[in-house]
C-alpha cells in the first residue's frame, strides 16, 4: 500500500477552477466517505484551502485509486473528468510524501513561507482523525509533515517577513491608495483570516473598520479586539454591506461562503453613493481584496471603473510573495533530509513484521524441540530442563540477532523491500503470518537476547 495524492492548486489552475473544486470543512467527511467506499482505498484525508484542494489516500493500486479519487472530485465539482485532469497533479509514494512536507513548510504556498498553511494541514488531519478515516500510514505522515513544517519555520528565515496572503494583499492596497493610515476599511468575515486582516489593518494605522458577518455576535467579538488597538470599529449585519461599501477605501472579504457575498449591485450602489467617477480608478480607487474561496466578490466587479480588485491570482504574482532564494534553498534542504529519513523509517517498519514472523517461527521450533526432549527424556529434572531451554533460546537468539538487525538496516535503503521478500523465501515464512503481525493480530516476540537477559522458560 502506498500514499496517493490527487490535487489542484493555484499553481495548476485559475481561481475559477479552484472555486468549483473548493470543499467546505464540514464536507470533508462526505468526500472521504465516498473515496473509502472503494476497496482499493484504506485511508483518506482532504486538505482544502483558498489555494488548493488535495486528497491524500492510502491505496492498494495506483490506477484504481486514482480513478476513484478523480471520479469523486469530478462528481463534487460538476467538472468532467477530462476537464478536471487538465488542471490536476498526481503524486505517488515518495513524491506524495515530499509534496505534503513542502506544503506544510509553506514552500508551495501563493506566498512562499506563510505559516497559515501549517494550521490548515493540522486542521485537515484533525478532521480526518475525528472522522476516523486515517490509519497508521496517514497518521504518521501527517504528524511528520507538521513536525517538518515547524522545523523549517524555526531553523530558516523563510517567514522572516511574516508574509501571508492577507498581508501581501493589504500591502498592495496600501501602495495603490498611497497608504492606509486614516482610511476606512470594510471587513467582510470575522473568522481566522478576518482577524489576521484586522491585525494588519491596525498596524497600518487604519482610521476605522466596519466588520460585517452573518453572525453579528462573532463580528462584535472581533470589533472588541480591534478597539483594543485604539482603532475605531463597529459591527454591522451583512445586510448593511452596500451602505458600508459607500464609505470604504479598502474592502477585505474572506467569508468562505459558497456564492459571492459582494455583488455587482452592492458595488454599483457604493460607487454611486460615494460619487466616485471613472477617474477615481487611478486617483483613488475602491480597493477590494477578495481572499475567499470560492470567491466572495462577483467577478464582474473587477470590470467596474473606479474599482481595483486584488485576488489570490494577483497576490501570487506579487514580488513580496516570494521569499529570498537562500531561505527557500535552506527550507528545501530540510524537507529533502526529512523525506529521506521518513522513507527510511517507513521501509524499516515494513520489514519488521517479516522479522517478527521469523522470530515467531524460531520460537515455535524451539518449543517443539523442547517438547520432543521432554518426551525422549521424561526423567529430566526441572532445573536441567530450564538450563537446556535457556541455552537453546540463547543460541537461536544469537544466530538471529545479527541478520535481523542487518536486514532492518538494509531495508531502510531504497529498494529495501526486496530483503524482506528474500527473508520470507529463505525461511519459508507464511505470508499470512507476516500479514497478521502487520495487522497487530500476532504479538511482537520479545527475545531474551534482545532484552539483554536470558528468557525464562514457560511451563
UniProtKB/Swiss-Prot annotation:
Gene3D superfamilies: Glutamyl-tRNA reductase, N-terminal domain, NAD(P)-binding Rossmann-like Domain. Pathway: Porphyrin-containing compound metabolism; protoporphyrin-IX biosynthesis; 5-aminolevulinate from L-glutamyl-tRNA(Glu): step 1/2. Its EC number is 1.2.1.70. The keyword NADP applies. Substrate binds at residues 49-52, 109, 114-116, 120. One of its GO terms (biological process) is protoporphyrinogen IX biosynthetic process from glutamate. It is an enzyme of class 1 (oxidoreductase). NADP(+) binds at residues 189-194. The active site is at residue 50. The record marks 99 as: Important for activity. Pfam families: GlutR_dimer, GlutR_N, Shikimate_DH. It comes from the Bacteria. The keyword Aminoacyl-tRNA synthetase does not apply. It catalyses: (S)-4-amino-5-oxopentanoate + tRNA(Glu) + NADP(+) = L-glutamyl-tRNA(Glu) + NADPH + H(+). Possesses an unusual extended V-shaped dimeric structure with each monomer consisting of three distinct domains arranged along a curved 'spinal' alpha-helix. The N-terminal catalytic domain specifically recognizes the glutamate moiety of the substrate. The second domain is the NADPH-binding domain, and the third C-terminal domain is responsible for dimerization. Homodimer. Catalyzes the NADPH-dependent reduction of glutamyl-tRNA(Glu) to glutamate 1-semialdehyde (GSA). During catalysis, the active site Cys acts as a nucleophile attacking the alpha-carbonyl group of tRNA-bound glutamate with the formation of a thioester intermediate between enzyme and glutamate, and the concomitant release of tRNA(Glu). The thioester intermediate is finally reduced by direct hydride transfer from NADPH, to form the product GSA. NCBIfam families: hemA (TIGR01035), PRK00045.1-3 (NF000744). Belongs to the glutamyl-tRNA reductase family. This is Glutamyl-tRNA reductase. It comes from Mycolicibacterium paratuberculosis (strain ATCC BAA-968 / K-10). The gene is hemA.
